[in-house]
Amino acid sequence: MAVVTTKQLLESGVYFGHATRKWNPKMKPYIFTSRNGIHIINLKKTSEEIEKAYQELLNIITSGGKALFLGTKKQIQSAIREEAQRSQQYYVDHRWLGGTLTNFKTILKRIELLHLLHKQEEEGLWKKLPKKEVVQLKRKRDKLEKFLGGIKDMKDLPQAIFVVDPEKESIAVAEARKLGIKVFGIVDTNCDPDLVDYIIPANDDAIRGVKLIIWLMANACVEGTGGVAEKAETFDAKNPLKPQNYNAPNKRPYQDSPRKPSYQNQNQNQI
């Protein structure tokens, strides 16, 4: 039985690509046609690639591996966090810190500090400190939790990383590839498919569609750990269909927000 239906993909709007003038020629095999200056992604290809990604991720998790879910766009942060937690995997839903994978020993030290701060607070040690110092400690803890909370239980590098928009998360993708970590990614028509090992051609601005794919990858992880994957009805209940305005200016259909520039020159030293 297919893990996703064409109807689900149609309803979620994953088939609308970018403007034809912005396309990456390497995405040609995944494009069906163009309409009103917008590329239309081939849903048959999307379905096939989702199946491949699902099975490979399932195999990795079944073999005892772990996955890291990465998506920092504001509209999908909650989905990344909730689905990673549901499937008992790691996640990063805020800015990626340079060196998270390639300089993991340093990241582990920050994680140890985060655990220490939590322990100190739980044991009541902060009650003995001046109020000003407690405020500073809480601020430090909250900042560490924001950027490292999703990987605070990660003792070793993951075997797979699932990325929403590999172009935006280029530093994370480069780190994973350097270390031989399998990269799964939602790739739009303006992206380079060579960045990832398992491509899922889809509109990365279609919020419901992106959530659908995140949900599917989480299901693969749930199955891989011996659990029961959620049914489509559960996803639909959590993400009801909304009417779309196909005539909205300066937007692709199903695009929930305009694109924002990506700032990737940030590093772990800022926390």
UniProtKB/Swiss-Prot annotation:
Pfam families: Ribosomal_S2
Domain of life, source organism: Bacteria
GO terms (BP aspect): translation
Compositional bias of kind Polar residues: 262-271
Keywords: Ribonucleoprotein, Ribosomal protein
CDD domains listed in its UniProt record: RPS2 (cd01425)
One Gene Ontology cellular component annotation held by this UniProt entry: cytosolic small ribosomal subunit
Location of region: Disordered: 235-271
A GO term, aspect molecular function: structural constituent of ribosome
Gene3D superfamilies: Glucose-6-phosphate isomerase like protein, domain 1, Helix hairpin bin
Homology family: Belongs to the universal ribosomal protein uS2 family.
PANTHER family: 30S RIBOSOMAL PROTEIN S2 PROKARYOTIC AND ORGANELLAR (PTHR12534), SMALL RIBOSOMAL SUBUNIT PROTEIN US2M (PTHR12534:SF0)
Name used for this protein in its record: Small ribosomal subunit protein uS2
Protein's organism: Onion yellows phytoplasma (strain OY-M)
Name of the gene this protein is made from: rpsB
